[in-house]
């Protein structure tokens, strides 16, 4: 039976991965082992009535007994442990949620509804390192898979509106704490006063700027605001998150660097767990809305086309509607009034913790289980 080690299973992405594996009965037919960086010997999860005992996630010997390792423990863990495992002589498969090894020449970025052929080729070629992609990129590509398959995209400008969950569990808690801080400092009379709303607006603005506003993790208020920069400053006007757009898109698709130019801005918004992206596309030819709908909806089962009208968009193309769902919404398709070029706009919305993080890892595990 295939020995599968799971690390980081108590974190936000790891918890979603564990939930999805239980829902899909992925523990049937594998011998699962749960590892911990801090609680080795302690109690792990209970699955099918069996209480698992945690193993030491820093033990190279214990890890080396695994045929497949899935880690959601983060980049620092990956950078410390993966090279040590290889030096020890481990020949197993490493499936990773962290970004540390995404651009490594040994790695295949996994998003099988979009790049299954590349994944199969990598397995056939002996690749053992499989890494989940950047969440905003993977969710956008999930929506655009039909256009990608038809080789229609010339370039993309991607403006992302990224949720707190993309930054981590502490950031989700902080966003909720910011909301609580504002609400706790407003009285019912202030909220229900039928007079001018301006005093209420001014007070909320003061609360947002208050030095008591919890900002230890974000470094700035997000509730009632945005954070116009994600990840490090590359010094050329781009954030590292924006650089990932082109670099990872082309690698996911198995294309030479720069084949599809991608750029834009990555913005943090006050949403819990769904990323959205407003995408301007230059296509290689004109595409009608009917053809666009056919292309995207026939690409894979997890894309939901939303007609470009107000009622459908407000009802079905929002984080509130899509959160917790495997469906990636795509809509607001229209031709831009920019000369006569085939330039179009679309909006994608997807759950950052599912297709943006955990689901590609879970599916990669099953691809390997069916191959080894």
Task: Please name every model-derived segment.
Residues 1-217, 257-261, 328-329, 333-339, ...:
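N-terminal Rossmann-like NAD(P) cofactor-binding subdomain of oxidoreductases
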Residues 69, 164-372:
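Charged docking surfaces used in two-component/phosphorelay signaling
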């Amino acid at each position: 039976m295939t020995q599968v080690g799971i690390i980081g299973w108590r974190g936000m992405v790891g918890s979603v991965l564990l939930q999805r594996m239980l829902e899909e009965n992925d523990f049937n037919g594998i011998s699962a082992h749960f590892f911990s960086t801090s609680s080795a010997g302690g109690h792990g999860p209970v699955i099918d009535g069996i209480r698992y005992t945690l193993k030491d996630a820093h033990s190279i010997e214990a890890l080396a007994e695994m045929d497949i390792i899935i880690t959601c423990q983060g980049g620092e863990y990956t950078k410390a442990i993966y090279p040590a495992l290889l030096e020890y002589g481990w020949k197993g498969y490493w499936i990773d949620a962290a970004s540390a090894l995404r651009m490594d020449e040994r790695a295949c970025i996994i998003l099988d509804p979009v790049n299954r052929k590349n994944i199969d080729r990598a397995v056939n070629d002996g690749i053992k390192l499989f890494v989940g992609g950047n969440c905003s990129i993977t969710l956008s590509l999930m929506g655009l898979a039909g256009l990608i398959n038809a080789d229609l995209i010339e370039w993309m400008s991607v403006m992302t509106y990224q949720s707190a969950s993309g930054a981590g569990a502490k950031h989700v808690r902080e966003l909720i704490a910011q909301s609580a801080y504002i609400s706790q400092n407003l009285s019912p009379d202030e909220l229900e006063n039928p007079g001018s709303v301006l005093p209420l607006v001014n007070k909320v603005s003061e609360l947002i700027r208050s030095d008591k506003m919890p900002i230890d993790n974000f470094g700035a208020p997000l509730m009632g605001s945005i954070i116009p920069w994600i990840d490090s400053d590359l010094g050329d006007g781009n954030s590292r998150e924006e650089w990932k757009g082109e670099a990872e898109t082309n690698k996911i698709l198995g294309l030479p660097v720069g084949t599809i130019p991608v750029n834009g801005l990555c913005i943090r918004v006050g949403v819990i767990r769904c990323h959205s992206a407003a995408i301007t596309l230059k296509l290689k030819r004109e595409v009608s809305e009917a053809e666009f709908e056919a292309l995207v909806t026939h690409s894979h089962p997890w894309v939901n086309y939303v007609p470009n009208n107000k009622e459908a968009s407000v009802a079905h193309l929002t984080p509130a509607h899509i959160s917790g769902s495997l469906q990636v919404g795509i809509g607001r398709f229209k031709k831009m009034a920019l000369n006569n070029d085939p330039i179009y706009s679309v909006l994608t919305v997807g759950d950052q913790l599912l297709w943006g993080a955990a689901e590609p890892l879970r599916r990669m595990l099953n691809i390997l289980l069916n191959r080894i």
